[in-house]
Structures are given as C-alpha cells and as structure tokens.
C-alpha cells in the first residue's frame, strides 16, 4: 500500500530529523544550526533582510526541557513556528515577520 502525500511528508520530516540527530535521537546545537541553514535558506534569507538574526536564540527557545539537546517533539515545535510563518506569508505577510519567532 502506498503512502498518502501527508504520510510521505511526515516520513520525510522524520528522515530529516534522523539525518541531523545523533545516536541518542536528539539534535545538538551545531547540528540544528546546520539543519536550518541547509533546509531553510529562503526563510533565513528573509529574516536577514528584515534585520532579524533568527538563529541567534532558536536553540535556547526550542530546548524546552533545557537539556541542551533538541528531541523530536522540540523539533516539531520549531517546524510548527516556521510553518506558521509560511502560512501567514500565504496571506500576505512577509516571511520572518514575527509571530512565533
């Protein structure tokens, strides 16, 4: 049985997380920054044009339990923030315009 488009998208997100996570299934700060630079160049470029350094505190903001690692649920929270920004962009807002960042 083939996966639906949304099921495939979720599988792709899991694979992306695993690409940057370590053997303990968490992402460390340097790897999160690399993930962001590798996978969100347009978003980060929009932030830069607006004078916002999105990466400067993203790790600390997303590390909810303060263990200095990003687990999968914290990763999903980060993606939700970015997806919300893209959703707002679809309604005319500029990328990286605030909100959950």
From Swiss-Prot:
InterPro entries from the UniProt entry: EF-hand-dom_pair, EF_Hand_1_Ca_BS, EF_hand_dom, S-100_dom, S100/CaBP7/8-like_CS, S100_Ca-bd_sub
Binding positions for Zn(2+) per the UniProt entry: 18, 25, 87, 91
GO cellular component: cytoplasm; extracellular region
Keyword Cytoplasm set for record: yes
Binding-site positions, Ca(2+): 63, 65, 67, 69, 74
Location of the EF-hand domain: 8-42, 50-85
Domain of life: Eukaryota
Main localisation: cytoplasm
Pfam family, one: EF-hand_1
SUPFAM superfamilies to which the protein is assigned, alphabetical: EF-hand
Chain positions with N-acetylserine modification: 2
Keyword set, alphabetical order: Acetylation, Allergen, Calcium, Cytoplasm, Metal-binding, Repeat, Secreted, Zinc
Protein name: Protein S100-A7
Organism, scientific name: Bos taurus (Bovine)
Gene symbol of the encoding locus: S100A7
């Amino acid at each position: 049985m083939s996966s639906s488009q949304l099921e495939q998208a979720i599988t792709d997100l899991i694979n992306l997380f695993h690409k940057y996570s370590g053997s303990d299934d968490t992402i460390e700060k340097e790897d999160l920054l690399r993930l962001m630079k590798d996978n969100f160049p347009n978003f980060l470029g929009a932030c830069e044009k607006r004078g916002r350094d999105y990466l400067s505190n993203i790790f600390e903001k997303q590390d909810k339990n303060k263990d200095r690692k990003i687990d999968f649920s914290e990763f999903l929270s980060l993606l939700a923030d970015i997806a919300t920004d893209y959703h707002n962009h679809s309604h005319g807002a500029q990328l990286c315009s605030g909100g959950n960042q």
